[in-house]
Amino acid sequence: MDIDRRNLMKGLLAGGALLALGTPSWTFADEPAKKAKRCLLFLGGANVDGRFANGVRVACQEVKYDGLETMKVNGGLLSDPGKLVSLFEQSKGARWIAVMDDASAAVFQELARTAGARLLSVGAHASVKDDACPLRHTWLAASPAQGAGAVLASRLIDAGESFSIIESFLDGSSAASKPTSWSAPGFASYRSSGSDAMHLHCSGLSLLEGCAQLGLTGVEGWTPIPSHVSQREVVSRQSPQWVESVGYAVAASALGGRIPESCSSRAFVHRAFTPHSLPPTQRFVSFVMDI
């Protein structure tokens, strides 16, 4: 099965916030620095700010990065966009990790584009009232090196919630390189045929069920990924709080050192056999970018 990346993009844009934002018109980074010398956490006034920030700080502690700067817009980004413009001017050369609600994200995107920001990743995150899949995450990233989905999957697997994570990489040139993949206990991993290879990691679902959950038809053209090309993501501490896990994953990708996969896109689907009560409905957007 040759998966058209444009079809995957449609799935990403159907995720909620990315539909509202549209495909970013600003510049995606071509070769961003692997390690951030200066990292800034921007809290856009969303109700998830505190939990997201906790996850970011844990990730910084694990890699012994103690230079994190935190900026917050009280009352939300829409109440004072001028402050954001000033922050962009004052933080040239910094790597930004940002979180905000959907409405603020549209304003943030335009102001960042005008400031010449180079985007590494943008993600839409949601908890919904759906027993089959209450936690849903979609990402656009410059390349597999900026992917955060594998880290998030490793953090969520023991949280007792079913989830789906979809990532698309604008630079998918690594798909034709030496095969590399991610692995975790309980996941079965597959690779699609074709030049725009996709990796699919399923836990608690068959390949057919995983494809159906993602809106992919049929299982033809998928082959199991051999274990000898796979590496396990090391996550030292789990968290029952999914928003904190998103903050951790986003920061881990921003700080570098994650496991890239040789693919143009990838997805993680997990079905919890003893799910917890459904989390409250929430939606927010995350960004990683260089100014």
PLM region spans:
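N-terminal export signals
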Residues: 1-29
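C-terminal segment of N-terminal export signals and the immediately downstream linker at the start
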Residues: 22-59, 63
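Intrinsically disordered, low-complexity boundary segments flanking structured domains
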Residues: 28-29, 83-84, 271-275
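Flexible, charged surface loops at secondary-structure boundaries
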Residues: 31-37, 86-93
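Long, low-hydrophobicity ectodomains and other hydrophilic envelope-associated domains
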Residues: 45, 64-79, 89-291
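Well-ordered, non-membrane alpha-helical segments in soluble/globular domains
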Residues: 50, 80-82
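Short amphipathic alpha-helical segments and helix-helix/interface helices
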Residues: 53, 57, 84-88, 108-112
